[in-house]
């Protein structure tokens, strides 16, 4: 296994005491993000409602990397709760708190307690591009076939 990429992290005051994000298995792609809501004030998300859940973390990604905030499959399948703008992108030059916009598509109010795993974060390399205007694009086997053009 290669040496892990080192990423600077700051725990904000309301995130103090929570463990840092961690991989749950040896080959996991995403680290679990935890809710940094007050111990005595769980956050309730009613059906059809959304909330920005604080993590109490700020990170400094190295240039050439991004972090994506993605839903946790268990929350989506069991409760209908997912990340609203999935995947959310954290750019390398962002230094603010990581917030997770969750939406409740379920039928019951979903309660988020301090330290609950609410999303996963995947760090990946980024390639920046430069557009090159051309009169015509090269042909491909697919051509301009859009949604559903390769099957169901």
UniProtKB/Swiss-Prot annotation:
Keywords: Hydrolase, Magnesium, Metal-binding, Nucleotide metabolism. Pathway: Pyrimidine metabolism; dUMP biosynthesis; dUMP from dCTP (dUTP route): step 2/2. It is an enzyme of class 3 (hydrolase). It catalyses: dUTP + H2O = dUMP + diphosphate + H(+). GO terms for biological process: dUMP biosynthetic process; dUTP catabolic process. GO terms for molecular function: dUTP diphosphatase activity; magnesium ion binding. The keyword Cell inner membrane does not apply. The keyword Metal-binding applies. InterPro entries: dUTPase, dUTPase-like, dUTPase-like_sf, dUTPase_trimeric. Its EC number is 3.6.1.23. Its cofactor is Mg(2+). Substrate binds at residues 72-74, 85, 89-91. This enzyme is involved in nucleotide metabolism: it produces dUMP, the immediate precursor of thymidine nucleotides and it decreases the intracellular concentration of dUTP so that uracil cannot be incorporated into DNA. Belongs to the dUTPase family. This is Deoxyuridine 5'-triphosphate nucleotidohydrolase. It comes from Afipia carboxidovorans (strain ATCC 49405 / DSM 1227 / KCTC 32145 / OM5). The gene is dut.
């Amino acid at each position: 296994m290669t040496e892990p990429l080192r990423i600077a992290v700051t725990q904000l005051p309301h995130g103090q005491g929570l463990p840092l994000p961690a991989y749950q298995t040896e080959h996991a792609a995403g680290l679990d993000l935890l809710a940094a809501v007050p111990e005595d004030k769980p956050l309730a998300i009613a059906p059809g409602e959304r909330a920005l859940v604080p993590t109490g973390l700020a990170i400094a990604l190295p240039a050439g990397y991004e972090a994506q905030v993605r839903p946790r499959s268990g929350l989506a399948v069991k409760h209908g709760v997912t990340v609203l703008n999935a995947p959310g992108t954290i750019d390398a030059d962002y230094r603010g708190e990581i917030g997770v916009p969750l939406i409740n598509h379920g039928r019951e109010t979903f309660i988020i307690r301090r330290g609950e795993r609410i999303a996963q974060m995947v760090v990946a390399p980024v390639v920046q591009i430069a557009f090159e205007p051309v009169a015509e694009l090269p042909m491909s086997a697919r051509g301009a076939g859009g949604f559903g053009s390769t099957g169901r």
